[in-house]
Curated annotation (Swiss-Prot):
Ranges for domain G-patch: 149-195
Species annotation: Canis lupus familiaris (Dog)
GO aspect biological process, one term: spliceosomal complex disassembly
Presence of the UniProt keyword Acyltransferase in the record: no
Record keywords, A-Z: Biomineralization, Cytoplasm, mRNA processing, mRNA splicing, Nucleus, Phosphoprotein, Spliceosome
Family: Belongs to the TFP11/STIP family.
Record gene name: TFIP11
Region feature Required for nuclear speckle localization, mapped onto this chain: 710-734
UniProt xrefs under InterPro entries: G_patch_dom, GCFC_dom, STIP/TFIP11_N, TFP11, TFP11/STIP/Ntr1
Protein name stated in the entry: Tuftelin-interacting protein 11
GO terms, molecular function: nucleic acid binding
Motif (Nuclear localization signal): 700-705
Signal peptide from the UniProt entry: none
Function: Involved in pre-mRNA splicing, specifically in spliceosome disassembly during late-stage splicing events. Intron turnover seems to proceed through reactions in two lariat-intron associated complexes termed Intron Large (IL) and Intron Small (IS). In cooperation with DHX15 seems to mediate the transition of the U2, U5 and U6 snRNP-containing IL complex to the snRNP-free IS complex leading to efficient debranching and turnover of excised introns. May play a role in the differentiation of ameloblasts and odontoblasts or in the forming of the enamel extracellular matrix.
Modified residues (Phosphoserine): 2, 59, 98, 144, 210
């Protein structure tokens, strides 16, 4: 092994002053690499073995390898070794760049002959196209080889649109002149002889790189292949924080502001150093120096890698570093605090400006309110002054109304917020009492309606008071009606006679849309109804010449269901009066007929069955059927009640008291050789006495068909020696005619029902929105032309009451309840419609 490294100085260089002296002392390199198994070793070359210390070596360009031979360069051309003398090893070895260079190499330091070595070729190979490589030939003869051909290439190009002197392509975007080549001066590498750009390149691409940019690019590319094992010093990188970054960050890493209160008195043991340290608060840890103890390596410093030189510890001043860092942190904190304070002041300015605007608006509003209130106060004081008895120009009700209208129009907010009740009590009530002082409601029912309507718009609150929830202290108009208008009504009702109902009804009809609902209910329930009830108790249908319906029925539009308690005593008195009645007396029908639409269908039918039907049955039982001399008075008395009693009751009377005797007379007549023409006239005459509704009843129809069958059997039998000519044909024709009429009537009824069903089906299909039970009842009422509307202010167990025709109902969970005599009875929808008709 060669000892050439011993002749170097501490940095590995030879001493130029002492070329003949050999130094054998231990250098720093020996100490650093004493225990380094990966230290660099020097391998002796052939030249060193031959010439020893006088050999010219360049150990930096050689690298140790495990093989005895150098790897072949397969990129070189094939070289045939001749049998003669072999060239020296120095010519075959290729130089490599050293990785251990410390100083960058500039391009000007290279020798002139620096470049790639000449390609070694044998004697059988010659370089080709030297003239083309050198660029000595001119391009003027480009394409001259076509002189010796037929010019097929040029012709094909012209057929495809090529124009001589222009470029190729659809838009002639191709190059016109061929790319020029420039011959390199020597055999060096690319760039060894400066720029190699041609004149054509300079014309097409005029941008020229400067020498500084080229030098910088060269040094950058060269430094990529360098390796600094000793860790050469790099240029330190500094990080700068701008004021904007500090503002954006808005905080500092350490809270080093003014001394703060201790977070907590907690004992903290720090064992991160060589010795154990005890702190008595968390804030004391932040004041600890961030410098390691003497003799201990920094945690960030790792032990030196094998084969690398250990770096000596840097120069450290922990106190100075701490003070500098403290100054930096304090400066950052001051900047951030100043920015926050500035932002706070700006926000405060904006807030104060908004507050100033709001306060200005509030001030203007308050000034307007004060001005308006001053004007309102002046007007009220003027009214009070004119209300004094000693005033020469007293205030009238019309002038007071104009003042209130002015307050409502021009000073609406103040008028709405003011206590109108006290204002009206003090000003309006005395004038209103004076206005109604001489009023008689029964003589002049419309007196004061316009005045009260005018004051209603001035005094009544926006929210209407519901029935039962009136509050006199909240609405000035309601209090005005109750305290001023109502005493006159009470006084006149106490003097009113219920049988003279028209003036009182007209009076209430005139005021019903003006006075509040609860006041109207109070009048009807507390004043009118007791008078009517007392008068009904004193009524006697046998002695009173005035019918009761003449002074009770006018109250139906106003009172409606309120009159229900009166109906039971009225029916009781009528029943007592009908005990000795005979159907020949038509006055009973005149008395009962007005009540048919007033009483409920059930109560009316029960009254008829109890008091009228037995009398009619007795009358029919006394009827004598005589074809030769018929007295029809009793029959007319019964048939006259057809509209009063139900069809089923009338048919029952006929089946029991009329048809048995009538059929018996027919059979007796047919058994005595009758005149069939007279029988036919007698049959048709009795049938014409009944209405179509009675004839359409199945029982009545069966009885008349039975009579036809008896007549047909009589003419078909051979009983008797003599038969009237044409009698059989006449009876057959009569039977056929009657049966056809029945069939046509039934067909017409079926067609009418089918049309009704079709209309209902179309209506159901047209309405795609599902209905509730109330909507269904409303639809049925429209189909049957029945009035269906709610009763204002009336409820039963919290359910709204409705009028369905002449009956009162309410709806509860899909069930209709009808008002009976004593209780509410559930009923079906069809029964409800039948009762309403």
């Amino acid at each position: 092994m060669s000892l050439s490294h011993l002749y170097r100085d501490g940095e590995g260089h030879m001493d130029d002053d002492d070329d003949e002296r050999e130094n054998f002392e231990i250098t720093d390199w020996d100490l650093q690499n004493e225990f380094n198994p990966n230290r660099q070793r020097h391998w002796q070359t052939k030249e060193e073995a031959t010439y020893g210390v006088w050999a010219e070596r360049d150990s930096d360009e050689e690298r140790p390898s495990f093989g005895g031979k150098r790897a072949r360069d397969y990129s070189a051309p094939v070289n045939f070794i001749s049998a003669g003398l072999k060239k020296g090893a120095a010519e075959e070895a290729e130089l490599e760049d050293s990785e251990d260079e410390e100083k960058p190499v500039k391009q000007d330091d290279f020798p002139k002959d620096f470049g790639p070595k000449k390609l070694k070729t044998g004697g059988n190979f010659k370089p080709s196209q030297k003239g083309f490589a050198g660029g000595t030939k001119s391009f003027m003869d480009f394409g001259s080889w076509e002189r010796h051909t037929k010019g097929i290439g040029q012709k094909l190009l012209q057929k495809m649109g090529y124009v001589p002197g222009r470029g190729l392509g659809k838009n002639a975007q191709g190059i016109i002149n061929p790319i020029e080549a420039k011959q390199r001066k020597g055999k060096g590498a690319v760039g060894a002889y400066g720029s190699e750009r041609t004149t054509q390149s300079l014309q097409d691409f005029p941008v020229v790189d400067s020498e500084e940019e080229a030098e910088e690019e060269f040094q950058k590319e060269l430094s990529q292949w360098r390796k600094d094992p000793s860790g050469s010093k790099k240029k330190p990188k500094y990080s700068y924080k701008t004021v904007e970054e500090l503002k954006a960050k808005g905080r500092i890493s350490k809270k080093l502001a003014a001394p703060q209160k201790e977070l907590s008195q907690v004992k903290v043991i720090d064992m991160t150093g060589r010795e154990q340290k005890v702190y008595y608060s968390y804030s004391q840890i932040s004041h600890k120096h961030n410098v390691p103890d003497d003799g201990l390596p920094l945690p960030s410093q790792q032990p030196p890698q094998p084969g690398k030189e250990a770096k000596a510890p840097g120069f450290a001043l922990p106190e100075l570093e701490h003070n500098l860092q403290l100054l930096i942190d304090l400066t950052e904190q001051e900047i951030i605090q100043s920015d926050r304070q500035l932002q706070y002041e700006r926000d405060m300015v904006v807030n104060l400006s908004h507050e100033l605007e709001k306060m200005s608006e509030v001030l203007e509003h308050e000034e307007r309110v004060i001005a308006n209130l001053s004007k309102v106060l002046e007007m009220v004081e003027e009214c009070e002054r004119r209300l004094q008895p000693s005033c020469s120009n007293p205030l009238t009700l019309d002038e007071c109304a104009r003042i209130f209208e002015t307050l409502q129009d021009k000073y609406y907010e103040e008028y709405r917020m003011s206590d109108r009740v006290d204002l009206a009590v003090a000003i309006v009530y005395p004038l209103m009492k004076e206005y109604f002082k001489e009023w008689d409601p029964l003589k002049d029912c419309a007196y004061g309606t316009q005045v009260i309507s005018r004051w209603k718009t001035l005094l009544e609150n926006d929210q209407l008071l519901s029935h039962g929830g009136q509050d006199l202290s909240a609405d000035a108009f309601h209090r005005l009606i109750w305290e001023v208008w109502m005493p006159f009504v009470r006084n006149i009702v106490t003097q009113w006679q219920p049988r003279n109902c028209d003036p009182m009804v007209d009076f209430l009809d005139s005021w019903v849309h003006i006075i509040p609902v609860w006041i109207l209910d109070n009048i009807l329930d507390q004043l009118i109804f007791p008078k009517l009830q007392k008068e009904v108790e004193n009524w006697n249908p046998l002695t009173d010449t005035v019918p009761i319906h003449s002074w009770v029925h006018p109250w139906l539009p106003l009172m409606q269901a309120r009159l229900e308690p009166l109906y039971s005593p009225i029916r009781s008195k009528l029943s007592s009066a009908l005990q000795k009645w005979h159907p020949s007396d038509s006055s009973a029908k005149l008395i009962l007929q007005p009540w048919k639409d007033v009483f409920t269908p059930g109560s009316w039918e029960a009254f008829m069955v109890k008091n009228i039907v037995p009398k009619l049955g007795m009358c029919l039982g006394e009827l004598v059927i005589n074809p030769h001399q018929q007295h029809m008075d009793a029959f007319y008395w019964v048939i006259d009640w057809e509209g009063m009693i139900s069809v089923s009751s009338l048919v029952g009377l006929l089946e029991k008291h009329f048809f048995p005797k009538w059929l018996q007379v027919l059979c007796s007549w047919l058994s005595n050789s009758p005149n069939y023409e007279e029988i036919t006239k007698w049959y048709l005459g009795w049938k014409s006495m009944f209405s179509d509704q009675v004839l359409a009843h199945p029982s009545v129809k069966d009885k008349f068909n039975e009579a036809l069958d008896i007549m047909n059997r009589a003419v078909s039998s051979n009983v008797g020696a003599y038969m009237q000519p044409g009698a059989r044909e006449n009876i057959a024709y009569l039977t056929h005619t009657e049966r056809r009429k029945d069939f046509q009537y039934e067909a017409m009824q079926e067609r009418r029902e089918a049309e009704n069903m079709a209309q209902r089906g179309i209506g159901v299909a047209a309405s795609s929105v599902p209905m509730n039970f109330k909507d269904l009842i409303e639809t049925k009422a429209e189909e049957h032309n029945i009035v269906f509307m709610p009763v204002i202010g009336k409820r039963h167990e919290g359910k709204q009451l409705y009028t369905f025709g002449r009956i009162v109902i309410y709806i509860d969970r899909g069930v209709v309840f009808v008002q009976g005599e004593k209780t509410w009875v559930p009923t079906s929808l069809q029964s409800l419609i039948d009762m309403a008709k």
